[in-house]
């Protein structure tokens, strides 16, 4: 007899998460744009757009980023977006984008 395969896809709680940007992260975006725009305005706009879109990938897998032990017990993590580091914190159903910067910046 043939086997019957059934595939079910169900959304987890992660699908119900939302993204919020801290004021410092928004300032970081403005700072990065201001730094890049005088050289190439189009590249600056594309960079900011990719950084703004990046956290959307976290909605389905919020724990994909590397956890930063120095912030425990908070759940602070980091991901790399091209040559930029983005730090975020998971609190209940909210992903807070905390800070972002170019990896070559002195931090």
List PLM regions with ranges.
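Basic, Lys/Arg-enriched alpha-helical interface segments
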Residues: 4-76, 94
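Enriched for short, Lys/Arg-rich terminal
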Residues: 2-12, 81-107
């Amino acid at each position: 007899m043939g086997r019957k395969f059934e595939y079910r896809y169900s959304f987890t709680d992660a699908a119900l998460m939302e993204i919020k940007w801290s004021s410092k992260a928004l300032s970081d975006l403005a700072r990065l744009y201001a730094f890049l725009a005088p050289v190439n305005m189009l590249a600056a706009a594309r960079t900011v757009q990719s950084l703004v879109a990046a956290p959307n990938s976290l909605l389905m897998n919020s724990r994909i980023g590397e956890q930063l032990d120095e912030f425990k017990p908070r759940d602070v993590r980091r991901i790399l977006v091209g040559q930029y580091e983005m730090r975020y914190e998971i609190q209940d159903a909210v992903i807070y984008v905390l800070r972002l910067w170019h990896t070559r910046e002195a931090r």
